[in-house]
């Protein structure tokens, strides 16, 4: 096995194609950008399978293995194997992906990376048959991960179908479930509350342990990822009005506005971040899991949330107005039946997550050993 550098085994090539120039181009050849396929055009720049790296802007350092007879736009860069060095393109792709090229970024406004910097990355080059064998192993692991993710998506679709089956289309004018203001399904108006302002909590008060501070990334992951920041117990007690306890619904009020998750029953109470909004429903009127899915699936509720969100640069929910949005109140027994169904589906999703995590750890271990 040879230990070389990326620059020893491949060369760069540039694209001068701007996405704005593709509007009138129609054909059979794919052209790609940082987010994937843009469209089919009537030309191509590469006639062999190749690697593309995002070199400018969002997604910088992301690596793609792309087909022959295709192209990329100017924010990406081609990596092409050099002649005379036997190398499997898939092996090269997995090796480059493992390098985490984003660490070479520079530029504050528009980040970018340069081949002259990352070409120094070391790469193991075994014989060609070993390269192909390693590539096949990674292909199989990736296929298993993709399959599990697809199963997880199907489980989400099953929950949505069950919601509609049990409660109908809540946006339909013919829907006859009683309605109530959101604040009226809470025991107290202050049960709907956004996190503490910067004057009440600043970053200097963050700790590495203590009481968890729950932020938007954790909500987006349905609380399946660990908190990044903590508060000491005295500070948490001072901010008790902004607590989150099992059964509370946490909602992002900035960025991905309206994304929400129910705080798990086996978690210790924490504090919500200023970008997070807490909804603590009265369990005698509304089941939290049903309420969360109503926030996700009801077209009527989603439109109301859009109306109470404002901001020219970044939307943010107006909490006072949110308290007055109208929600549906099906019989509590029906809500509980739906919540029980979701609990069973969540167990299946958890098993899929564990499998995905296992395969990802396996892949990482193999990359560290072989690449």
Model-derived regions, located:
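Short, ligand-facing micro-motifs at secondary-structure edges
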Residues: 17-21, 38-54, 58-71, 89-91, ...
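Sequence-specific dsDNA recognition surfaces
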Residues: 7-48, 64-66, 71-74, 183-203, ...
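Short hydrophobic-aromatic micro-motifs
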Residues: 30-33, 39, 51-54, 78, ...
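Non-catalytic DNA-recognition/assembly elements of restriction-modification systems
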Residues: 1-17, 21-33, 120-136, 146-147, ...
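A short glycine-rich beta-alpha junction/loop motif
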Residues: 70-77, 109-129, 208, 269-277, ...
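Ligand-binding loop in jelly-roll beta-barrel domains
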Residues: 83-88, 266, 281-287
């Amino acid at each position: 096995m040879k230990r070389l550098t990326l620059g020893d085994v491949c060369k760069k090539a540039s694209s001068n194609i701007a996405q704005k120039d593709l509007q009138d181009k129609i054909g059979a050849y794919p052209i790609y950008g940082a987010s994937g396929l843009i469209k089919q055009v009537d030309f191509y720049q590469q006639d062999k399978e190749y690697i593309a790296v995002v070199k400018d802007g969002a997604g910088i350092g992301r690596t793609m293995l792309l087909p022959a007879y295709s192209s990329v736009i100017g924010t990406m860069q081609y990596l092409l194997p050099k002649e005379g060095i036997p190398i499997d393109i898939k092996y090269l792709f997995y090796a480059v992906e493992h390098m985490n090229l984003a660490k070479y970024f520079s530029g504050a406004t528009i980040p970018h990376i340069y081949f002259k910097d990352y070409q120094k990355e070391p790469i193991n080059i075994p014989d060609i048959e070993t390269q192909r064998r390693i590539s096949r192993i990674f292909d199989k692991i990736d296929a298993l991960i993709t399959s599990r993710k697809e199963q997880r998506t199907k489980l989400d679709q099953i929950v949505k179908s069950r919601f509609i089956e049990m409660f109908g289309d809540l946006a339909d004018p013919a829907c006859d479930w009683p309605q109530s203001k959101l604040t009226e399904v809470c025991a107290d108006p202050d049960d709907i509350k956004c996190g503490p302002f910067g004057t009440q909590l600043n970053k200097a008060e963050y700790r590495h342990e203590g009481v968890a501070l729950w932020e938007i990334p954790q909500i987006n992951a349905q609380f399946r990822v660990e908190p990044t920041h903590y508060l000491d117990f005295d500070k948490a007690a001072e901010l008790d009005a902004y607590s989150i306890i099992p059964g509370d619904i946490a909602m992002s009020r900035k960025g991905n506005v309206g994304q929400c998750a129910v705080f798990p029953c086996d978690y210790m109470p924490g504090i919500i971040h200023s970008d997070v909004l807490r909804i603590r429903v009265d369990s005698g009127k509304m089941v939290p899991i049903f309420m969360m899915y109503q926030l996700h699936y009801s077209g009527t509720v989603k439109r109301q949330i859009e109306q109470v969100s404002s901001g020219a640069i970044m939307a943010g929910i107006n909490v006072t107005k949110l308290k007055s949005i109208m929600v549906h109140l099906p019989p509590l027994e029906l809500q509980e039946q739906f919540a029980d169904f979701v609990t069973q589906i969540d167990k299946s999703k958890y098993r899929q997550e564990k499998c995905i995590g296992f395969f990802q750890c396996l892949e990482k271990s193999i990359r560290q050993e072989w690449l």
